[in-house]
Regions:
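Extracellular polysaccharide-degrading/modifying enzymes targeting complex plant/algal/animal polysaccharides
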Residues: 1-60, 101-112
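Short glycine/acidic-rich loop motifs that flank beta-strands on beta-rich extracellular proteins
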Residues: 6-12, 43, 65-71, 89-95, ...
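Structured core elements
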Residues: 68-70, 150, 165, 199-201, ...
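Right-handed parallel beta-helix
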Residues: 1-3, 52-63, 75-90, 102-132, ...
Length: 293
């Protein structure tokens, strides 16, 4: 566990409790996988579990050592809107399952009781700045295994690693995640300290999920990362499947589709996307006042 001596993270600050090598290596989804890991969930300033119809409206969370706000499990029909996250030590806004509780991280998560799934969440018109200032592997806005969740019109400016991350488990097999939407977000100044990242990043099978009309601007690449070229505006990683990625603006077509599963559709992404789409990304007019705080 984390201590004064530090900790070993798997990804996004989720720390390894136990791990071992696979002999022979490989799983049905990932033939070359040679390790397994069991993880713990980092703390947050505010956590929510087993709740429905919860709203965070115009709240401010800042100067944290770990994460900001975390919808941990069994949270449904809830919203975070018009909130300000600033100077966050780890992940700014977190939601969903990340294969904890003794479940191995690389296996598809399908709970017997679907009431435990975080579902029908809306994260809209939030401003997230200077995230992952203490644990550099953090993400400004990260949703693990969630269902029918909308991440829209948020603005992210400054994060050590990834802007928005959706999915978990590194598997193309069916899991509980589906029907999610990442739409019209504005992301700039990501990857300030860590590479192998994307402005928007996905993992695993997510039937019916759409990534659309986002604007991802240039990162700020640290001069001392191990591979300063290993970053992308859009990054569908291990097992990403059944996801539609369309009409996203970026300065160039720098995208990565790494070990994806079937059924992904990429349509009209890059600098040729309409300037109207680029201009509409980020905070809507009623929430522009957040930029002045």
């Amino acid at each position: 566990r984390p201590s004064i001596s530090g900790h070993v993270p798997l990804q996004a600050g989720f720390f390894i409790l136990d791990a071992y090598g696979l002999k022979p290596k490989g799983t049905p989804d990932w033939r070359s996988l040679d390790n397994q890991a069991w993880i713990g969930r980092p703390p947050a300033a505010v956590t929510v579990s087993g709740a429905q119809h919860v709203s965070f409206d115009r709240c401010r969370i800042e100067h944290t050592a770990a994460s900001g706000l975390d919808f941990v499990d069994a949270v449904q029909d809830s919203t975070v809107e018009g909130c300000r996250f600033n100077d966050i030590g780890l992940n700014g806004l977190v939601a969903g399952e990340f294969a904890g509780g003794g479940f191995e991280s690389h296996l598809p998560w399908n709970p017997a009781d679907e009431r435990t799934i975080c579902a029908r969440l809306k994260f809209t018109n939030n401003l997230l700045t200077d995230c992952a200032t203490e644990d550099w592997g953090g993400v400004a806005l990260i949703a693990g295994i969630v269902r029918d969740t909308t991440i829209a019109h948020n603005e992210i400016d400054g994060t050590s690693y990834t802007g928005i991350s959706l999915g978990w488990s590194w598997t193309r097999s069916a899991n509980a995640s589906r029907g999610n939407l990442i739409h019209a977000n504005l992301i700039r100044n990501f990857a300030t300290r860590v590479s192998d990242t994307g402005g928007i990043y996905t993992l695993s099978a997510q039937p019916g999920t759409v990534v659309s009309e986002n604007a991802v601007l240039h990162p700020i690449i640290s001069p001392y990362v191990h591979d300063p070229e290993h970053w992308y505006y859009l990054y569908t990683d291990e097992g990403s499947s059944l996801i539609t990625v369309r009409d996203n603006w970026s300065p160039e077509k720098r995208f990565l589709q790494n070990a994806n599963g079937p059924g992904n559709q990429w349509e009209n992404n890059g600098p040729q996307v309409s300037e109207k789409i680029k201009a509409a990304a980020g905070l809507e007019p009623a929430f522009q006042d957040l930029l002045k705080q």
